Every structure is written in structure tokens, then in C-alpha cells.
């Protein structure tokens, strides 16, 4: 990630400040300089706040970032533009605050944009989703970003000197190693659950084994004392329990069969005697009922005689019933005939009355015809009364509108003539303006070129002076280098390789004697005295090292000076200051002002003419519009006059109200007449139809009455003849016979019931006599008591059988459950054995006494130390390297850092380093950590890094080494920014971001050295 721009509003000491990081070249090192409290670190806070909504350090809260000098209505906001993976993004984050006059905070705001086709497109507009988007985009969270992007004051010294526990919390955050500890906890929890599960299974086996029934057998009871872990013995004893249970069950089933046979015999005897007792009682009851039935014989004989009489007089009764019906019909016909005669008379009278009413209506026929003609002629006007009324009302309004339009029309004509006079002798000229513009551009270009040339000449002179100074320094350094090389050449290098070989030579001397052959040169040894001055050799060797070190340093300085001279030559070539004719800038400026004045005057004339033309065009448009309006209004007036004249000519009224009253009256007269005439005609037709129907009914009634009288006479003759044959003397006797005939069905039913019951009793009594014949009745109570005793005995036996069967089945089920649990238990123990071992190893019960998480963190720490040592070796002149302390303890060991000193060839505690050495180690560790986190965070590349303070503890030489390290960083493509008060840095670093403060507000500005 590389910063491009940042805009801070009401953020710390910055009320409204913009920093353009694009002024920093791709691989340039720059310094952030300013007084204490001016807001240097706040720049980092703004970047981290824009990305993650928090400050660059944990100690600062969001509320601490808002400027104390911000007004009460403006929010604190940061707009941050940056580039990552060749994509450009812009973030606008606004902090919540309590606006002046309110009591609740405003909502936080976050908008994230991406640059697509030179336009920013919105990607996220919600705070939570936006925060997740940033983490996914950068691949690091806020804590990791703090460690990668900013090296804050004292943070890495603290990390360097911290113990394993403190380092664990930091590394855990950076490398998300909690997941490894979660794995350990999950595995441990799984092991605990599995152990509980195994214990539960043994408990289940024990409970099931204790529930096994022994059938009160002492031998089986002894088997139940086996422990739940003795599963093999349990399985071997299962068949003995089942065999003994089946043996007991068989003995009880044999006893049951014997009792069942005895019970069946008793039940059969009891059933036979119960049936005999019931049949005896039933025979006695049937005989009593049969005797009672015989007592009704006389009543039945009387009913039979009445039935015979009804059957013999059947024809006579039919004649009598028909005669009574005909007489009733005759009386009804006589009554209807008299009523019809009365109705005929009433209809004749009503018809005469309606005929007179119709004659009266015909006298108004001519009057109604005239009304109808008027209504037809003026119906269209009556239907458009509102329109006619509106025409009367609109006519004077339109006449007044026409008068007003003529007046305004004349005014516009006058105004147009006045404008035409004013526009005389005034013309637009855009060509001359273009000419003036072109001349002005040329003059400005000449002036700018002259001023630039003047500045370049001054800069060129300064570069010449700087170049001359650096050439002198270069000459001086080369002379020093030649002197050092000459000194090294003059030192006698003979025997220099024997340095540090004194002990080896003494060992050889102690093993040799005079006269022996030398193992190195092969010559005879004549003397064992001191032939080599080891102290002199060591002094020469140290002197060569010092000269070589000084030589390397001078060469580095020569390279830096040559680089600076090359840079100055490059800048001279860019300036290319050739001697040119100098222009009079003041004279050129006067010409420019004169041309601007002429251009402004012509532009004013053009604007005035355009204004006149615009007004004239508006007036012409208005005149044309007035012509259209007048034509439209006159047309409307003509239409209204035609409509009013037509109305008055046809209606013969000049008043709409009078016409409406007369038209309504005429319409009502016509409607009333038509209604009365139609109503009268309909009534006459109705009465004539009723009269015809009534006369036709009278004819039919007369015919029916004659026919009925004739039929009555014939029936009376037939009845007299039938009465003589049957011996009936009067109609009353016939009526009594007819009444008795109505009871015929009931009489027949009673006779049939009697005969049926009589026959049924005879058959049942004979059947029962056969059933009880020759049989002796036993004592039923004694039989019942014997059956109850036998049933109780059978129930007890069945209960014993059911209990034993249940116990056998229950034992079998429990045996199967125990077998299944044992099988599951065996399978689980095979699988979980390795998991139990793995859980103990991950929990720290291993040779290294390390948990899984600490083992992973040690791996990351060693990678960090490896990266850090590459820089620390350079900064310390190959003297120091960081090493991990490999002490063994439980859980949190292995994260302490020691330093290895190659001068003493020993490791020592990190706190033994001086302040400058501690800074070197901290810086190297910070850079190493940054690189490792980038490697582990999905390949995210941070193209920038900021270092906050720490250089004040360094001496001049160490400071130079630290700066060289940072220069190597920026040469790898990173933009590196440093916050420091050290004055040497201001001289060494070519680009400075100055932060200035006026007690309440700060400002920033890039400045080049």
C-alpha cells in the first residue's frame, strides 16, 4: 500500500490540511520534521483512522483525535487516497460527535471508492461492511497494520526486551495463532468428553449387569459380583442365566396345561346346568302367558262378525260416500254462479266510467301537439344551458381582453423602434477578441519563460558551487584512500597468517626435541627457542584491520560523493542554461495589460450588442404572440355571438332562466297528458278482458251444475235398491256401516295378532318340554365356587409364566445391550488411544515442554530473527546477532531473545546492550517483523513505512549505519518516512515534510534540501 493524498479536517491540530504524498518519489527517503506537539504522529493517526477507525497506537482513543479548536457544527473527517496492487482507492471516514445544540451523537460515516476509468465509483457506504472490505483488501487487521506501517516510539524496544508471555500476546495478534490454541482446547475438550463417554459406558454396563435377574438362584447371584471392567467373563456367563430361566418356565407351563383341562370340565358342567335352569323357568312363564291369551277369545269372535258385515256392505258404502261428495260439489257450483253474475254487472259499470274519461282527454290533443313541437325544436338548447349561460358571461370578458391586447401590442411596437435607434453604430466582433487572446497568450508565455530562465540561472549557479564543493571533497577522500592503501602496503605481512596460532605452535614445540625432523618444513630441529614474535604479529594484524575498516568507510563516502556529483550533473543537464537574449519583463507586462484592456472593452461591446439583440428577439416573439392571441380571442367572440343568436331566434327568449321555466312547464304538460291517456286505455283493455273471462266462466258453471244434479239422482236410485237387498231401512244405518268400515284395518290387525300369538305359544311350550325332559338340575353355586378357585389357580400360574418369560426376555435384551456397549467401547478405545496421546503432546507434555501455539510462535519468531539479523549484522559491523533463548519450561518458554556477541563469542541478555545498540536491534527486529508479517498475510505489499523517533540515542557512526539501512530499504522500492528531531537527519535526507504550528493549528509543507 502506498499513500497518495490525505485531507484532514478538525483532526488533532489540523483544522483543514492536505498532504500530497505523490511529491515523494517512488523509492525516496523523507523526513517528517517539526516541534514537539506540532502533530507529526497525528499524520499516522489520520491514515490508520481512515482505514480502521482508530489511532496508530492503542493508548489514543477516537475521542482524543478531534481538534479542540473545531467549531461545534463541523465533524472530524479524513479523506485518504492510496494505491494497492495497482488499484487506487479513496476512503472518506467521518467520526460521530455531539453537534452544538444536540444531546446525542451523530452517526459515524464511511464511504469507500475505487478509481475506474478516471472516475471514483462507490464500493461500500456502511461502516461495518466498509471495515470488513478494508481488512479483506489489505489482508491485515488494524493491529497488524500498526506493526507493518508504523514503527512507533519505544514499541519495538519493549517487544525486544519482553518476556515470553508478553511476546506471545503480540505475536498471537500478528499471526492469528489463537487458532492453534483453539485446536488444543478443542482436542482437550474432545478427550475429556471421550473419557466421560467411556466412563458412562462402563457405568451403563454396570447398571445393566446389576439389573440382570438371577431367578433366586445363589450360583447366578455370585456371578453378578463381577466388576464392569470384566467384560469377557460377563459374556461367558450369559448362557447360564438363559438356560436356568428356560428350565423354570417349562415346569410352570406343564402345571398350567393340567389346570386348564380341569377348568374346561367344570365350565362345561356349569353351562349345561345354567341352560337347564333357564329352560325350566321359561316353560312355566310361557304356560301362564298362553292361559292369559285364551281369555280374549270372546272379544276376537265379536270382531270377526263386524268384519263380515263390513265386507258384505262394501258397495253400498261406496255409493253413500260418493253421494255425499256430489251434494257438496253442487252447493259450491251454485254459490260460484251467483258470484259470477254479480262480477259481470260491476265490470259493465267500470267500463262506462273509463270511456267517459278517455273522451275528456281527446279535447287537449292540439295543445299537447304544439308543446311537443316546441320541445323537439329547443331540446338541444335545453341540454346545453350551462354552455349558453357561459357564453353570455364570457362575451363581455373577451371583449375587454381584446381591448387590453391591442393596448399592449402598440406599446411593444413603440419599444422595438426605440431599441433599433439605440443599436445604431454598435457591432459585435469576436475575431478581434480571438486575436487579442492569442497575443496575450504569446506575451504570457514569453514572460513565464523569462522568469523561469531567471530562476534556472540562479539554480544553475548554486549547483555549480555545490558541485565544486563535492569535487574538492572527492579529491580529498581519494588522497586519504591512497594514503591508507600505501600504509597497508608498507606493513610487513610476513608471518601474518600465524596470528592466533600461538597455542598450536607451543603444542608442536612441546612434542618435539632437538634433532627431530620438523613436521611442517621437514628439516632437522636445531633449537626450540622463540623464533616468532606473536605480539608483533597481532599488533600488525589489528593495524591492518583498522586501516581496512577506515578504507571501507572512506570508499563508502567516495561512493556517496560520486553519487551526489552524478546527481548534480544530471540536474545541470536538465536545466540546460544556455545564454539567451534577456527580455524586458516590465515592458512586456505593460503590453500585456494594454491588450487585456482592449480585449475587455470589446467584450463589453459584444455583451451589450448581444443583450440588445436578445431584447429585440423577445419583443418580436411577444408581438407575434399578441397577434396569435388577438386572432384567437376574436374567433372566440364570433363563436359566442353565433351561439347566442341561434338560441334567441329558436327559443324566442333572451333570458336563459325564462326559457328554462317555460321549457320545463311544457315538458311536464306533455308527460302528464301521455301518462293519463295511456293509463286509461290500459284500464279499459283490462276490464274488457275480465268481462269476457267472467261470461265464459258462467257458461261452464251452468253445464257442471246440470251434470252434477243428474249424477245425484242416479246414485239415489242405486242406493235404494242395494239397501233393500241388505236389509238397511234408513240412511243412518248406512252411515253407521260407513263409519265402521273406517276401522276395518285395525279389526283385521287385532285378529291376526291373536292368531299369531296363539300359534307361537303352542310351538315354544312343546320345544321347552322336550329340552327339560329326563334331566336333573345340579347345585349351580357349588359349581361356580369350584370354577372361581380353579381360575385363581390358573391366573397365578399364568402370572408366574409371564414373569419368568419377561425376566428371560429382559435378561436377553440387557445381554444384547451389554454386548453392543462392549463392542462400541472396544472400537472407541482403539481410535481414541492416539487422540489421547496427541492431546497430551499439544498440551505441552513433550520433550520440548511446548504447547502447539508456542511451537508455532517460535517458528515465526525464528523467521523474524533471521530477517532481523541480516540488517543487525550490517548495522553492528558483524558484531551482534539476535538468538532465541532455548530454555525448557512448561507452556510459555522459548520466546525470549538474547544477543550473541561475536567479539566475546558468547550470548548475553538483551538488556546488556547500550542505548544505541538497543535501537539498532529494535529497528532490525521491527523491519524483520514487518517483512515476515507481509509474507504470512497473503502476499500484501506495503510500499511505504514510517519510523517514529529513536535516532536520538545513536552516535554519529551508528546513525550513519542506521540511515544506510533505511536507504537500502527505500532502494528496494519502499517509500520510507522518518519522524525525528536529530539535526544530522535534516542534512542527510533530501526531502522534508515540515509540520509547523501556531499554538492552535498546524500546517504541512514538503521542502527539498
Curated annotation (Swiss-Prot):
<keyword id="KW-0235">DNA replication</keyword>
<dbReference type="InterPro" id="IPR027417">
    <property type="entry name" value="P-loop_NTPase"/>
</dbReference>
<keyword id="KW-0269">Exonuclease</keyword>
<dbReference type="Pfam" id="PF13558">
    <property type="entry name" value="SbcC_Walker_B"/>
</dbReference>
<dbReference type="GO" id="GO:0006260">
    <property type="term" value="P:DNA replication"/>
</dbReference>
<feature type="binding site">
    <location>
        <begin position="34"/>
        <end position="41"/>
    </location>
    <ligand>
        <name>ATP</name>
    </ligand>
</feature>
<keyword id="KW-0255">Endonuclease</keyword>
<dbReference type="GO" id="GO:0006302">
    <property type="term" value="P:double-strand break repair"/>
</dbReference>
<keyword id="KW-0067">ATP-binding</keyword>
<comment type="similarity">
    <text>Belongs to the SMC family. SbcC subfamily.</text>
</comment>
<keyword id="KW-0540">Nuclease</keyword>
<dbReference type="GO" id="GO:0004519">
    <property type="term" value="F:endonuclease activity"/>
</dbReference>
<dbReference type="InterPro" id="IPR053380">
    <property type="entry name" value="SbcCD_Nuclease_C"/>
</dbReference>
<dbReference type="GO" id="GO:0004527">
    <property type="term" value="F:exonuclease activity"/>
</dbReference>
<keyword id="KW-0233">DNA recombination</keyword>
<keyword id="KW-0378">Hydrolase</keyword>
<dbReference type="GO" id="GO:0016887">
    <property type="term" value="F:ATP hydrolysis activity"/>
</dbReference>
<feature type="coiled-coil region">
    <location>
        <begin position="397"/>
        <end position="499"/>
    </location>
</feature>
<keyword id="KW-0175">Coiled coil</keyword>
<protein>
    <recommendedName>
        <fullName>Nuclease SbcCD subunit C</fullName>
    </recommendedName>
</protein>
<dbReference type="Pfam" id="PF13476">
    <property type="entry name" value="AAA_23"/>
</dbReference>
<keyword id="KW-0547">Nucleotide-binding</keyword>
<comment type="function">
    <text>SbcCD cleaves DNA hairpin structures. These structures can inhibit DNA replication and are intermediates in certain DNA recombination reactions. The complex acts as a 3'-&gt;5' double strand exonuclease that can open hairpins. It also has a 5' single-strand endonuclease activity.</text>
</comment>
<dbReference type="InterPro" id="IPR038729">
    <property type="entry name" value="Rad50/SbcC_AAA"/>
</dbReference>
<dbReference type="GO" id="GO:0005524">
    <property type="term" value="F:ATP binding"/>
</dbReference>
<comment type="subunit">
    <text>Heterodimer of SbcC and SbcD.</text>
</comment>
<dbReference type="GO" id="GO:0006310">
    <property type="term" value="P:DNA recombination"/>
</dbReference>
Amino acid at each position: 500500500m502506498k499513500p497518495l493524498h490525505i485531507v484532514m479536517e478538525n483532526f488533532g491540530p489540523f483544522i483543514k490540511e492536505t498532504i500530497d504524498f505523490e511529491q515523494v518519489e517512488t523509492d525516496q527517503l523523507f523526513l517528517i520534521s517539526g516541534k514537539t506537539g506540532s502533530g507529526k504522529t497525528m499524520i499516522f493517526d489520520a491514515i490508520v483512522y481512515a482505514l480502521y477507525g482508530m489511532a496508530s497506537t492503542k493508548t489514543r482513543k477516537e475521542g482524543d483525535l478531534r481538534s479542540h479548536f473545531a467549531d461545534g457544527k463541523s465533524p472530524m473527517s479524513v479523506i485518504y487516497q492510496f494505491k494497492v496492487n495497482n488499484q487506487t482507492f479513496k476512503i472518506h471516514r467521518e467520526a460521530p460527535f455531539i453537534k452544538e445544540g444536540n444531546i446525542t451523537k451523530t452517526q459515524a460515516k464511511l464511504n469507500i471508492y475505487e478509481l475506474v476509468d478516471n472516475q471514483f465509483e462507490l464500493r461500500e457506504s456502511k461502516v461495518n461492511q466498509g471495515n470488513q472490505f478494508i481488512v479483506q483488501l489489505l489482508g491485515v487487521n488494524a493491529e497488524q497494520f500498526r506493526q507493518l506501517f508504523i514503527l512507533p516510539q519505544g514499541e519495538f524496544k519493549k517487544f525486544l526486551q519482553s518476556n515470553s508471555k508478553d511476546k506471545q500476546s503480540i505475536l498471537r495478534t500478528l499471526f492469528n495463532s489463537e487458532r492453534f490454541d483453539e485446536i488444543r482446547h478443542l482436542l482437550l475438550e474432545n478427550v475429556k468428553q471421550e473419557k466421560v463417554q467411556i466412563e458412562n459406558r462402563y457405568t451403563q454396563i454396570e447398571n445393566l449387569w446389576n439389573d440382570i435377574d438371577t431367578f433366586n438362584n445363589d450360583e447366578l447371584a455370585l456371578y453378578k459380583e463381577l466388576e464392569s471392567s470384566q467384560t469377557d467373563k460377563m459374556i461367558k456367563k450369559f448362557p447360564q442365566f438363559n438356560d436356568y430361566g428356560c428350565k423354570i418356565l417349562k415346569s410352570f407351563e406343564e402345571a398350567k396345561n393340567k389346570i386348564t383341562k380341569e377348568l374346561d370340565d367344570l365350565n362345561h358342567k356349569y353351562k349345561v346346568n345354567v341352560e337347564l335352569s333357564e329352560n325350566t323357568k321359561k316353560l312355566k312363564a310361557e304356560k301362564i302367558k298362553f292361559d292369559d291369551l285364551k281369555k280374549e277369545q270372546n272379544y276376537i269372535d265379536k270382531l270377526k262378525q263386524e268384519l263380515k258385515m263390513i265386507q258384505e256392505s262394501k258397495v253400498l258404502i261406496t255409493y253413500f260416500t260418493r253421494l255425499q261428495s256430489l251434494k257438496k260439489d253442487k252447493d259450491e257450483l251454485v254459490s260460484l254462479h251467483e258470484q259470477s253474475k254479480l262480477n259481470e254487472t260491476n265490470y259493465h259499470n267500470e267500463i262506462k266510467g273509463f270511456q267517459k274519461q278517455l273522451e275528456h282527454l281527446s279535447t287537449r290533443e292540439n295543445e299537447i301537439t304544439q308543446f311537443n313541437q316546441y320541445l323537439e325544436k329547443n331540446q338541444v338548447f335545453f341540454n346545453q344551458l350551462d354552455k349558453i349561460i357561459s357564453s353570455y358571461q364570457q362575451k363581455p370578458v373577451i371583449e375587454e381582453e381584446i381591448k387590453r391586447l391591442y393596448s399592449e401590442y402598440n406599446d411593444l411596437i413603440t419599444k422595438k423602434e426605440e431599441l433599433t435607434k439605440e443599436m445604431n453604430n454598435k457591432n459585435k466582433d469576436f475575431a478581434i477578441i480571438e486575436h487579442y487572446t492569442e497575443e496575450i497568450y504569446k506575451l504570457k508565455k514569453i514572460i513565464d519563460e523569462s522568469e523561469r530562465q531567471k530562476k534556472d540561472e540562479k539554480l544553475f549557479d548554486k549547483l555549480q558551487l555545490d558541485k565544486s564543493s563535492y569535487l574538492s571533497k572527492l579529491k580529498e577522500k581519494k588522497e586519504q584512500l591512497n594514503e591508507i592503501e600505501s600504509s597497508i602496503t608498507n606493513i610487513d605481512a610476513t608471518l601474518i597468517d600465524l596470528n592466533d596460532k600461538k597455542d598450536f605452535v607451543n603444542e608442536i614445540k612441546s612434542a618435539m626435541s632437538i634433532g627431530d625432523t620438523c613436521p611442517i618444513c621437514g628439516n632437522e630441529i636445531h633449537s626450540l627457542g622463540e623464533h616468532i614474535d606473536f605480539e608483533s604479529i597481532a599488533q600488525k594484524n589489528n593495524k591492518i584491520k583498522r586501516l581496512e575498516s577506515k578504507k571501507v568507510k572512506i570508499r563508502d563516502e567516495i561512493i556517496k560523493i560520486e553519487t551526489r556529483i552524478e546527481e548534480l550533473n544530471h540536474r545541470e543537464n536538465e536545466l540546460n542554461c544556455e545564454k539567451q537574449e534577456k527580455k524586458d519583463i516590465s515592458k512586456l507586462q505593460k503590453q500585456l495589460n494594454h491588450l487585456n484592456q482592449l480585449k475587455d472593452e470589446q467584450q463589453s461591446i459584444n455583451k451589450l450588442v448581444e443583450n440588445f439583440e436578445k431584447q429585440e428577439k423577445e419583443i418580436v416573439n411577444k408581438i407575434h404572440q399578441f397577434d396569435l392571441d388577438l386572432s384567437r380571442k376574436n374567433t372566440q367572440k364570433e363563436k359566442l355571438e353565433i351561439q347566442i343568436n341561434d338560441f334567441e331566434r329558436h327559443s324566442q327568449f333572451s333570458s336563459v332562466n325564462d326559457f328554462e321555466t317555460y321549457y320545463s312547464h311544457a315538458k311536464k304538460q306533455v308527460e302528464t297528458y301521455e301518462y293519463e291517456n295511456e293509463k286509461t286505455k290500459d284500464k279499459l283493455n283490462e276490464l274488457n278482458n275480465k268481462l269476457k273471462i267472467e261470461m265464459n266462466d258462467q257458461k261452464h258453471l251452468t253445464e257442471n251444475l246440470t251434470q252434477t244434479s243428474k249424477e245425484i239422482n242416479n246414485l239415489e236410485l242405486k242406493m235404494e235398491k242395494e239397501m233393500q237387498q241388505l236389509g238397511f231401512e234408513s240412511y243412518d244405518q248406512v252411515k253407521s256401516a260407513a263409519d265402521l268400515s273406517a276401522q276395518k284395518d285395525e279389526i283385521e290387525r287385532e285378529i291376526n295378532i291373536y292368531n299369531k300369538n296363539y300359534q307361537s305359544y303352542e310351538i315354544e311350550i312343546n320345544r321347552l318340554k322336550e329340552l327339560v325332559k329326563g334331566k336333573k338340575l345340579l347345585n349351580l353355586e357349588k359349581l361356580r365356587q369350584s370354577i372361581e378357585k380353579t381360575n385363581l389357580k390358573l391366573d397365578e400360574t399364568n402370572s408366574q409364566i409371564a414373569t419368568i418369560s419377561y425376566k428371560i426376555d429382559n435378561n436377553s435384551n440387557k445381554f444384547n445391550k451389554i454386548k453392543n456397549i462392549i463392542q462400541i467401547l472396544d472400537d472407541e478405545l482403539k481410535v481414541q488411544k492416539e487422540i489421547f496421546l496427541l492431546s497430551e503432546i499439544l498440551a505441552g507434555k513433550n520433550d520440548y515442554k511446548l504447547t502447539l501455539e508456542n511451537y508455532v510462535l517460535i517458528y515465526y519468531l525464528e523467521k523474524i530473527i533471521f530477517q532481523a539479523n541480516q540488517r543487525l549484522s550490517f548495522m553492528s559491523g558483524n558484531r551482534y546477532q539476535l538468538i532465541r533463548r532455548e530454555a525448557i519450561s512448561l507452556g510459555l518458554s522459548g520466546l525470549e531473545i538474547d544477543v550473541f556477541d561475536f567479539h566475546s563469542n558468547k550470548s548475553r541478555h538483551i538488556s546488556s546492550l547500550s542505548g544505541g545498540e538497543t535501537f539498532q536491534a529494535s529497528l532490525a527486529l521491527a523491519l524483520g517483523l514487518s517483512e515476515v508479517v507481509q509474507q504470512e498475510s497473503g502476499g500484501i505489499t506495503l510500499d511505504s513505512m514510517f519510523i517514529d523517533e529513536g535516532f536520538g540515542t545513536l552516535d554519529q557512526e551508528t546513525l550513519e549505519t542506521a540511515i544506510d539501512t533505511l536507504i537500502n530499504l527505500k532502494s528496494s522500492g519502499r517509500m520510507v518516512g522518518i519522524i525525528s528531531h536529530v539535526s544530522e537527519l535534516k542534512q542527510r535526507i533530501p526531502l522534508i515534510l515540515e509540520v509547523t504550528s501556531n499554538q492552535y493549528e498546524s500546517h504541512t509543507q514538503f521542502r527539498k534540501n
